[in-house]
Amino acid sequence: MLAVIAPAATAYSLIGTSSRSHTVTAQVSAQAPVAVQAPFALTGARMRTRTPAVQMSEPAGGKKKVFVLGGDGFCGWPTALHLSNLGHDVVIIDDLSRRKIDVELGASSLTPISTPEVRVATWKEQTGKDVKYVYMDLQNEYDRFLKLINDEKPNTMVHFAEQRAAPYSMKNGATKRYTIENNMGATHNALCAIVESGLDIHLVHLGTMGVYGYGNSGGEIPEGYIDVMLPGGREKNILHPAYPGSIYHSTK
C-alpha cells in the first residue's frame, strides 16, 4: 500500500454561471495535507479536495423556476422552502414514497408531518409565496414528467427523488429491487427528459460519500478523475473507484 500525500488546499470560491441559471457558489476552507492509502500510485495534479457545501445564491436577473424532485422528504422540503424564500418559483414533485415506507415499517416522525397540500398552503399563509406540489412517480410516469417539463420550463432541477435508507435497501429482496429500480430509474428518466425536452436545464443530484465506502481511504476522497500508475509503469486517468457498502449506496 502506498501512502499518497495530497497538497493542502487554500480557501477559494467556485463560481459557475449560465445565461439560463443563476450563480452557484461553493466555499472551500484551508485544509492540512491528507494521507491517502492506495494500492496504486496517484500521479499528476488531479487530486482535488471535496467541496463541503454548495449554496444557491440570491436570484440574479429575476427569479428562476426550480423543480425539487422528492420535495416532500426530510431534505427536499426545507430545500424547497429555502429556494422559495430566496424568490425562486418552486415546483415540488413527489410520490410520497417516504410516507408509504414509514407506514410499511410501522414507523412515524417524532413530530407530526402534515400532508403536502397543507404544508404548501401553510407556507403561502405565512409568507405569501406560492410553492406548487405535483404528485408524480418519476420512475413510472416518464411521459407525464416530460409534459410537465415542457409546460413549466424549469431552469434547474434539484434531485432528491430516491429511496434514502441504506438499511431499508438491504432488508429483503423486494426492498433491494425497489431501491435499484426507483433510484436508478428516476435519475435516468430525469436525465432523458431533460435531453428530450431540448431545454437548457441544470440538474443538481444529491449523492453520498458512502458511494466510495466509509473509512477506507484514510483521508479526503479525491473528486472526479485521478491519474494512476498501473503495474508495469503505465499511466492511466480513471474515475475514482467506488466502494459502496449497500444497495442504496450502489445506486447513488
Language-model features: locations:
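Short acidic, low-complexity intrinsically disordered linear motifs used
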Residues: 9-12, 51-55
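Intrinsically disordered, low-complexity terminal segments enriched in Ser/Thr
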Residues: 47-49
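N-terminal chloroplast transit peptides
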Residues: 1-44
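Generic extreme N-terminus detector
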Residues: 4-6, 51, 60
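N-terminal Rossmann-like NAD(P)+-binding domain of SDR-like oxidoreductases, especially those catalyzing
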Residues: 57-252
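Glycine-centered signal
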Residues: 23, 27, 51-54, 248
